[in-house]
Amino acid sequence: MLALSTGYRVMIWQRWGLRLCSKKTYCLSLFFHSQFGQTGAENEKKCVPLQTERRKKTMREYTDEELSQLLDKDIFHHISEAADELGVECYVVGGYVRDIFLERPSNDIDVVVVGSGIAVAEKLRKILGKRAHVSVFRNFGTAQVKYKGMEVEFVGARKESYSHDSRKPVVEDGTLEDDQDRRDFTINAMAICLNKSRFGELVDPFDGIGDLWEGIIRTPLDPDITFSDDPLRMLRCIRFATQLNFFIEEETFAALSRNAERIKIICGERVADELNKVMKSQYPSKGFFELQRCGLLPLIIPELSALDIVETRNGRAHKNNFYHTLEVLENVARAEERLYNKEKTENLKTGAFQPNVWLRWAALFHDIGKTKSKRWDNQQGWTFHNHNDIGARMVPEIFRRMKLPLDSKMKYVQKLVELHMRPIAIADDVVTDSAVRRLINDAGDDIDDLMTLCEADITSKNQVRKKQFLENFRIVREKIADLKERDYKRLLQPVIDGNEIMELFHLKPSREVGELKKALKEAVLENIVPNEREPLMALLKEKAAQLGIG
C-alpha cells in the first residue's frame, strides 16, 4: 500500500465532504493528525456521524410491505405471473434493489431465476405480447426484455469458479444463495422476491442494508478471492466508492493492494469504461486518490502516479503535483456544476447534468509532462519548463494504451493540455488584445473549456497572488467576450487562402506559400489590416516582392 503524503491535500476532500476514512481509521490517522493536530479516531467521530446524517437524507428503510408497494408496477406483476406459472423462484437483484434504498430512479432491472431465466423471459413475452421486445443469448443463459422504456435482464441462479489467468468463470446452476455469494459487493447482493406468495420480501444475507446505511463498500465473501477471481471488481470497488461517496472497508481495501497486479489481465476497454464512470462522478478526484492509495494507479496510468512525489534540494521543495492535479480535477467538476445550475436557473439548460468527461481527462493530464520536464536551477529552484508541450505529446500514447478514443476527443484533450499555460501567462502580464486574439484563434471553439481548466489550475495557497490571478482572469474573460462580439470576423482565417496564393503566383505547395499565408494571418491577428480582400491583397503582393516572388 502506498504511503500518504502530508500537507494541505486533505483539505481538498474535507472541503467537499468526501469520505476518506476507512471504517477502522487505520489509513488516515497520521494524515489527519499532521493537518489538524488530532487523531484519526477523533476525526472519524466527526466524519462518520456527519456522513450518516447525510445518508438519512438519501436513504430510506422499508418494510417488506412497503417494498411490495414500491414494486407495484405492471412489469413486476407480469414477471411474477410468468415465474409462478413455471413454478420457479424469481428475484429482482443487484443495482435496482440498491437504488430503491438510495431513492435513485432506475430503468435497468436484473432478475435472477432459480431455474431457467430464458424460460421466464419467453413466458413473459407471451404475457406482454407485441409490446415487448425479447433478445435471447443462449450461450450465456441470459435473456433481455425491453418494455415501456425499461430493460429487464433475466439469468438463472448460478455459482462460479475461475482459473488464475482468466476472469471468464466456469458456470454451474445454483441456488439464490450461490448467486448472492458470487456478487461483487454486499450492497449489490440484496434480492427482493417477486413470486406472489412472497412478493416484496427482502433477502439480505450479508447486511447490504447496513453497509448502505454506513456508507461502506465490502465484499460478501473473502475479498482476496473476489478480486483474484475477477480483477475488474477492483475497479468497480473504486468506482462505487466514488459514485456513492462511500468508504472502502479495511480488509476489502487491503485486498485491493494485495491483488493489484491482477489488473493486468483485464482488457483496456473494460478499464477505460470503469475510469470514465469514475470521471462522470460528482467527486472524480476521490476515485483517483483511492487508485493511487491502493497501488492500482501505477499499473494503469503510471505517468499520473509518478507525479506523487515531493523532491527537496537546498531546502527548496516543489509541490506534490499529483495532489495538485486532483485539486484541479475537483475544481473543474465544481465549475461544471456551477455553470449547469446557472444555465438551469436561466432556463438555458434542461434535463440531467451531463459532465464533460473529456474536459475532466484534460484536467487529469494537464501536468502529466512535469515528471519529464523537472529540472533544478540554482537561481530559480525547481522548474517545469515546457511541461505543457511535453504533456501534449504524451497524450496520444496514453490514450492508445488505455484504449481511449483516438478521434476528436483525444485531440481535444491534447489541445487543452498544450494550451493550458497560455491564459495563465496572459493573466500574469498586461492583458493585450493581440495576445487574447491569438489565444482565441488557437483554442477555437474550445476557448471556454480552456478557460475553465486554466482557472481551475489556480490553486496557489498564497492568497494575495491567487486573488491577483483571479482578477486578471476576469479581465481575460471579459476581453475574450468583447473580442468575440466586435471582432468575430477577424478571428476567422484570412479571406485569401493558400490555394489562391498558389494560383496567383503560379506556385506549387512550398515554404514560400507557407510564409505568405503566415504573413496574412499575423497581420489579421495583430489588427494591422482588416480581414478584407483588398487590403490583404496589397499586403500579399508587398510580402511576395520581399521574398522575390513575381
Residues covered by each model-derived region:
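Catalytic cores of the polymerase beta-like nucleotidyltransferase superfamily
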Residues: 13-17, 26-32, 46-49, 53-550
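Short, low-complexity intrinsically disordered segments enriched in A/P/G/S/L with frequent Arg
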Residues: 4, 20-21, 39, 47-48
